Amino acid sequence: MGPTINCEPTKRGDLVKVTFSLVARNGNARVALVGDFNGWRQGANMFKRRGDTDVASVTLSAGRRYEFRYVDDDGTWFNDEGAHGYAPNEFGGDNSVVDLRDGFGKPDD
């Protein structure tokens, strides 16, 4: 199983719980979820190990798109293969995108 993004509306309706899941990295490597929703701070949203999967959840405002990436213990930044899209960043690469504008992040077919 590759990376997955699950988006669920909350009871408030204007917020969406977004859960990011990754195949657990080798050994005890830790992964951080970083993005425009947390100021790109590496310690703000850490993945938690659940069996052979690393999981992180954030609650975000519906109706917009967010850019994010993952960074592991050794400082390696990487994107989500299951992202809803990608956006160029100022470092010459791309950021992953989760799109909560319509349908709570379900990519177009």
Where do the protein language model's features map onto the residues?
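N-terminal edge beta-strand
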Residues: 1-14
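Aromatic-rich carbohydrate-binding modules that target alpha-glucans
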Residues: 11-65, 73-101
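Compositionally biased low-complexity segments at domain edges in trafficked proteins
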Residues: 2-3, 98-109
